[in-house]
Regions:
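C-terminal transmembrane helical hairpin of 12-TM major facilitator-type secondary transporters
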Residues: 57-101
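A late C-terminal transmembrane helix in Major Facilitator Superfamily
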Residues: 109-143
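Conserved glycine-rich helix-kink/hinge and helix-boundary motifs of the Major Facilitator Superfamily
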Residues: 1, 30, 61, 116-120
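Transmembrane alpha-helical cores of Major Facilitator Superfamily
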Residues: 4, 34, 38, 120-128
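Helix-loop boundary and gating motifs at the non-cytosolic
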Residues: 1-32
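Multi-pass alpha-helical transporter architecture, strongest
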Residues: 102, 150-175
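Intracellular helix-loop hinge segments at the cytoplasmic ends of transmembrane helices
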Residues: 19, 98-109
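Helix-to-loop junctions at the C-terminal end of transmembrane segments
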Residues: 42-56, 141-142
Length: 175
């Protein structure tokens, strides 16, 4: 579930920021894409470094809280350089989250004999849900007529997917 939610969120950011919002701000798409990839990779490396000293739950809470804050700020600010900085911060956090989700997925399927089938199924479901979520995102944007509303939608989305769902699952696992 976490993997699917992350994939849907990543596609939203990739499509709406990298293509539509970049055009409105006047940045070069190649430059932004390169910075985006560097931030994503740096986030993954950073996760590998800090995961040895901090617990997974603490990293998730800090990361998700920071991401929600960056989304909300992105929806309220107008300075294009601050928006670019926030975008790169979001991508750095997404890179950290990617490493964390990979680690969590590996823990979840450790010892399973049909790992490839499980991963393929999750990937297939993720692609379908990504398509559905992009359709919903498009509809929301058409209703409100402003891209900035999508940053608030993203903040709520990531709050639900990365905080509420894992906390509910954790409570169920305790029982």
């Amino acid at each position: 579930m976490l993997n699917v939610g992350y994939d849907c969120g990543t596609q939203f950011i990739l499509i709406y920021w990298s293509i539509i919002y970049v055009e409105k701000l006047g940045f070069n798409l190649s430059l932004v894409y390169t910075l985006f990839m560097c931030a994503l990779i740096l986030g993954s490396v950073l996760f590998n470094k800090i995961s040895t000293s901090l617990n997974s739950k603490g990293i998730t809470l800090l990361n998700t809280g920071s991401m929600i804050g960056a989304f909300v700020l992105s929806g309220t600010l107008k300075n294009k350089y601050l928006l670019l900085f926030l975008f790169l911060l979001i991508e750095l956090l997404m890179g950290m989250m990617s490493g964390q989700i990979s680690a969590t997925s590996n823990e979840a399927i450790y010892g399973e004999s049909n790992k490839s089938t499980m991963l393929s199924t999750v990937s297939f479901i993720a692609e379908i849900l990504v398509s559905v979520s992009l359709f919903i995102s498009n509809s929301i944007m058409e209703i409100f007529g402003d891209l900035k509303v999508m940053f608030f939608v993203s903040a709520v989305y990531f709050g639900v997917v990365l905080l509420i769902i894992p906390l509910i699952k954790e409570k169920q696992d305790v029982r």
